[in-house]
From Swiss-Prot:
Modified residues (Phosphoserine): 15
Protein's name according to its UniProt entry: Glycogen phosphorylase
PROSITE patterns xrefs: PHOSPHORYLASE
Enzyme class: transferase
Annotated organism of origin: Drosophila melanogaster
Co-factor requirement: pyridoxal 5'-phosphate
GO terms for biological process, alphabetical: defense response to Gram-negative bacterium; determination of adult lifespan; glycogen catabolic process; insulin receptor signaling pathway; negative regulation of innate immune response
Top-level taxon in the UniProt lineage: Eukaryota
Function description: Phosphorylase is an important allosteric enzyme in carbohydrate metabolism. Enzymes from different sources differ in their regulatory mechanisms and in their natural substrates. However, all known phosphorylases share catalytic and structural properties. Required for glycogen breakdown in skeletal muscle.
Length: 844
């Protein structure tokens, strides 16, 4: 098989990326050497690959800084309405290649490195992923930042600069082991510390009454130090800011110790304050009411709101004087988007500032708060909803608890007015949950304190209205909206799949990265044998590239002409990696039963992290690895079936996986996955989907037509009906000999001969405690997979479907999503106008 072209080779051909200009290449080389000498203080004799990466990153950043400053000047001069995106997670991945692409300097940088005898791909591999997120929610925030900059919105991301991001996953003896992700150990060339904007954040203390009103006193103070990260728009000279807060101990730390003479202890205790931004909580779709997590949430909200108000009050660039001294226009100038309930303390915090510090009336402050804030819900799983114990809030944020109580009191009065004598409805709609330990329901607070509430796919938004938030929908239907998620086509096609990007550009030009709906024009070539051949060639090159990575990293040799069947996402019971595993075992049993039968070879890859405390998820990983061990070492199976668990799945690995996939597994139980965005990345890169009618799969099927996707399993209504009727897994187990054999193997120790009871608990879950109806969907899943195998053998048909998938991806650009948020929630208008480049105008 021919050796795949490297991305660098491919990019030397004429492509979307344009041609490197000689003068620019010379300039890049000059700046690169300057940074090597003056920033890193190295010469070529002692420089390492990492030094070269830092020199290149700084060179690229130099190209961005003028645009960054100019963009911020532009916002101060024009004073548009600002959008503030508040999120506890930003799963950014790497920045170097994305920045070069968005600035339009990729060819120059590659050529300059080539002339200096360096391979730019080796330099790119030196960059640490910025893993400040768990999964979908954090990656969505990152895609949104890219789109907000590309659409010219005056937008600011706010979050926390975790010293340790999502843990690095190692698989040892088939088990997940977590290692800390020390992503900052070599420094981060993209960020700029801003100590001059350091802000105080208070905790604990008590509330007193004064003639001016309530006052929060005797607090413990921590400082929030901002680090600014540039977010370049695509080819429009806009550079927005992601501001991440880091916790710093105050200078006048703990006088008690000084008075006791224990100076050393006082210095050591500074660490306690700084622990707030130490580490990202590694829970995805699971609420764990920890004190430190509550502090993180408030820390981010308190620092961010001070910054928002400072910027609102300042009238022009560089002004620190308060010029706007009335808050009447605040909602006309400020939109605050809460990414899930994690930043929902922004609502009581804004009320506290307006009432206690700015001395507005409650009514005025509440009107401003509601008109400024909007809330995005990301999950319907009850265990994921944030419900903070009152005792914790009382201790850490006593004033905020009072404010929440008052918000709830007025809210209950409104409910009573609209639905008199309905005590049960009042109980259901209260922010204060009284049964068991008293808790505050943060979703209820977010709905009441926002002017807009949205789900992230049509089916999810419908479920919110029909069940999860039905009472609130009946009370204020006008608040509820849908904003189907999207992905940035810059990272998820242009960056990760240059071969396919070039094929598309040859057919429809080069505007599609900002107008993804133009991909629909590809439909006319879906049956074209030449175009099919080219799409197949690019896919094969991407598969060879991934195969080489897998061989190098996992020591597994795979058959690159097999179907690459991939499921990558957080490991969670509702995502049903276990159902995938049942299919693998079924295929294995079929091969063993009749090794000569016609069989479509598959390489099945599963990747994702399990939360460290989630025992069942870790057992599922262990089972997948154990099954892989049996399958991959069975000579009868040979090349027909391989199973690989992809260790340490992260953004950078996703960029290598998505372009190489043939089949995308999106098999959550209907009604559990809010949207999903991995499904969109696979589709955009030409993989076909096997999936349930859940999340965005529903809209993907609508866009491409049911004949271009493999849909199976129960619908939301059918799941509901089965739940009502009563689900007995044994009925399915006894009725289907294939699934019976699979479960007997799992519980009998077939995959764990050294410990026959190792996976008995998994069989127990499947047969006795299965909340996600795996056996009810098993038969439909296996039949759908059989159809997948049959279709794959007809490559002309498969490629036609693949091209139709790509052509139907337009809706799922995060640009479309953000344009909808802008117009329908934030009240701002996207613009595709370019700002002048810094060199085109005089600098002030």
């Amino acid at each position: 098989m021919s050796k795949p072209q490297s991305d660098a080779d491919r990019r030397k051909q004429i492509s979307v990326r344009g041609i490197a200009e000689v003068g620019n290449v010379t300039e890049v080389k000059k700046n690169f050497n300057r940074h090597l000498h003056y920033t890193l203080v190295k010469d070529r004799n002692v420089s390492t690959l990492r030094d070269y990466y830092f020199a290149l990153a700084n060179t690229v950043k130099d190209n961005m800084v003028g645009r960054w400053i100019r963009t911020q000047q532009h916002y101060y001069e024009k004073d548009p309405k600002r959008v503030y995106y508040l999120s506890l997670e930003y799963y950014m991945g790497r920045s170097l290649t994305n920045t070069m692409i968005n600035l339009g300097i990729q060819s120059e940088c590659e050529e300059a490195m080539y002339q200096l005898g360096l391979d730019i791909e080796n330099l790119e591999e030196m960059e640490e992923d910025a893993g400040l997120g768990n999964g979908g929610l954090g990656r969505l925030a990152a895609c949104f930042l890219d789109s907000m900059a590309t659409l010219g919105l005056a937008a600011y991301g706010y979050g926390i600069r975790y010293e340790y991001g999502i843990f690095a996953q190692k698989i040892k003896n088939g088990e997940q082991v977590e290692e800390p992700d020390d992503w900052l150990r070599y420094g981060n060339p993209w960020e700029k510390a801003r100590p001059e904007f350091m802000l105080p954040v208070n905790f604990y203390g008590r509330v007193i009454d004064t003639p001016e009103g309530k006052k929060w006193v005797d607090t413990q103070r921590v400082f929030a130090m901002p680090y600014d990260n540039p977010i370049p728009g695509y080819n429009n000279n806009h550079v927005n800011t992601l501001r991440l807060w880091s916790a710093k101990s105050p200078i006048d730390f703990n006088l008690k110790f000084f008075n006791d003479g224990d100076y050393i202890q006082a210095v050591l205790d500074r660490n306690l304050a700084e622990n707030i931004s130490r580490v990202l909580y590694p829970n995805d779709n699971f609420f764990e009411g920890k004190e430190l997590r509550l502090k993180q949430e408030y820390f981010m909200c308190a620092a961010t709101l001070q910054d928002i108000i400072r910027r609102y009050k300042a009238s022009k660039f560089g002004s620190r004087e308060a010029v706007r001294n009335t808050f009447d226009h605040f909602p006309d100038k400020v939109a605050i988007q809460l990414n899930d309930t994690h930043p929902s303390l922004a609502i009581p915090e804004l009320m506290r500032i307006l009432v206690d510090e700015e001395h507005l009336t409650w009514e005025k402050a509440w009107d401003i708060t509601v008109r400024s804030c909007a809330y995005t819900n990301h999950t319907v799983l009850p265990e994921a909803l944030e419900r903070w114990p009152v005792s914790l809030l009382e201790s850490i944020l006593p004033r905020h608890l009072q404010i929440i109580y008052h918000i709830n009191f007025l809210h209950m009065e409104n409910v009573k007015k609209k639905f008199p004598d309905d005590l049960d409805r009042m109980r259901r709609m209260s922010m204060v949950e009284e049964d068991g330990e008293k808790r505050i329901n943060m979703a209820h607070l977010s709905i009441v304190g926002s002017h807009a509430v949205n789900g992230v796919a049509a089916i999810h938004s419908q479920i919110l209205k029909d069940s999860l938030f039905h009472d609130f929908y009946e009370m204020e239907p006008q608040k509820f909206q849908n904003k189907t998620n999207g992905i940035t086509p810059r990272r998820w096609l242009l960056l990760c799949n240059p071969g396919l990007s070039d094929l598309i550009a040859e057919k429809i030009g080069d505007e599609w990265p900002v107008h993804l709906d133009q991909l629909v024009a590809l439909k006319k070539w879906a049956k074209d044998p030449n175009f099919q051949r080219n799409v197949a060639r690019v896919k094969q090159e991407n598969k060879l590239k991934l195969a080489a990575i897998l061989e190098k990293d996992y020591g597994v040799k795979i058959n690159p002409s097999s179907m690459f069947d991939i499921q990558v996402k957080r490991i969670h019971e509702y995502k049903r990696q276990l159902l995938n595993c049942l299919h693998i075992i079924t295929l294995y049993n079929r091969i063993k039963k009749d090794p000569t039968a016609n069989f479509t070879p598959r390489t099945i890859m599963i990747g994702g992290k399990a939360a460290p405390g989630y025992y069942v998820a870790k057992q599922i990983i262990k089972l997948i690895c154990a099954v892989g061990n049996v399958v991959n070492n069975d000579p009868i199976v040979g090349d027909k079936l391989k199973v690989i668990f992809l260790e340490n799945y992260r953004v950078t690995l996703a960029e290598k996986i998505m372009p190489a996939a043939d089949l995308s597994e999106q098999i959550s139980t209907a009604g559990t996955e809010a949207s999903g965005t991995g499904n969109m990345k696979f589709q955009l890169n030409g993989a076909l989907t096997i999936g349930t009618l859940d999340g965005a799969n529903v809209e993907m099927a609508e866009e491409m037509g049911l004949d271009n996707i493999f849909i199976f399993g129960m619908t939301v209504d059918e799941v509901e009906a089965l739940k009502k009727k009563g689900y007995n897994a044994y009925d399915y187990y006894n009725a289907n000999p294939e699934v019976k054999q699979v479960i007997d193997q799992i519980q009998g120790g077939f995959f764990s001969p050294g410990n026959p009871n190792e996976f008995k608990n998994i069989a127990d879950i499947l047969l006795k405690y299965d909340h996600y109806y795996l056996l009810a969907d098993y038969d439909a899943y296996i039949k759908a997979q059989d159809l997948v195998s049959k279709t794959y053998q007809n490559q002309a048909k498969w490629l036609e479907m693949s091209i139709n998938n790509i052509a139907s991806s337009g809706k799922f650009s995060s640009d479309r999503t953000i344009a909808e948020y802008a117009r329908e929630i934030w009240g701002v208008e996207p613009t595709w106008e370019k700002l002048p480049a810094p060199e085109d105008q005089p600098q002030n």
